């Protein structure tokens, strides 16, 4: 009886028997999805079913849509292709049988941490729903579950420690990369921001507006000194903030400088002229 129970315990579950196939299917779907998003980003075409006034279009056009100068979707594509390769490679190849599952676990752990950060940005920072991003997150979560449950791991404690370590390193690297993607402000941006604050020149915008993000990026970190009014604190389609309504704001971004209204993204030089800031002081 004892030997029979031991034999039953050693039998593979249905998930363990089919885990590589399931991983290949999930990774294949993820590869197709991220390849499509990479294509739309590189060709500057809108993704299907995305509108220009909210949702996935705003997420996919945000500054987090690029990572180290390439589309963030391309990073996901590399991850999914890596999982696909590890899932389908035959055991007969050198080192594959021994290192397949440790490599899968490390790669999927990194992908999971990266996607969780993307989820945080989507929910807490951009506050927009992106069906493509959500689908990618679900696929990566599926890869994580199958990787953990679809293989007989000998040391659960070591596995948990490894995940924490990989996730920590991935998050630190990701946050560091995005933090350094914002260039230091130019002397013109610093001086102009201080001047706008002094004269009360104000930008009216919305956190979900991609053109507002473009305007902010022209200032870089100096934008923190620019007077700014958030006109849509509750998201697209909700009532405008009273201060914006009273100011007659109808589009974003809008500047009101010295009593005059300027709509759309404006260069730093144009804002300097409008506000009376001497350009030579910012050189």
From Swiss-Prot:
Cysteine residues from the thioredoxin-like domain participate in a series of disulfide-exchange reactions that regenerate the redox-active cysteine residues in the transmembrane domain. Pfam families: VKOR. A quinone binds at residues 59-65, 111-122. It is a multi-pass membrane protein. Residues 1-20, 88-102, 150-158 are cytoplasmic. This is Vitamin K epoxide reductase homolog. Its EC number is 1.17.4.-. Changing residue 41 to S: Reduces enzyme activity by about 75% with dithiothreitol as in vitro reductant. Gene3D superfamilies: Glutaredoxin (3.40.30.10), VKOR domain (1.20.1440.130). It is an enzyme of class 1 (oxidoreductase). It comes from Synechococcus sp. (strain JA-2-3B'a(2-13)). One of its GO terms (cellular component) is membrane. Keywords: Disulfide bond, Membrane, Oxidoreductase, Quinone, Redox-active center, Transmembrane, Transmembrane helix. Disulfide bonds join 50-56, 130-133, 209-212, 231-244. Thiol-disulfide oxidoreductase that catalyzes vitamin K-dependent disulfide bond formation in periplasmic target proteins. Residues 186-283 are annotated as: Thioredoxin-like domain.
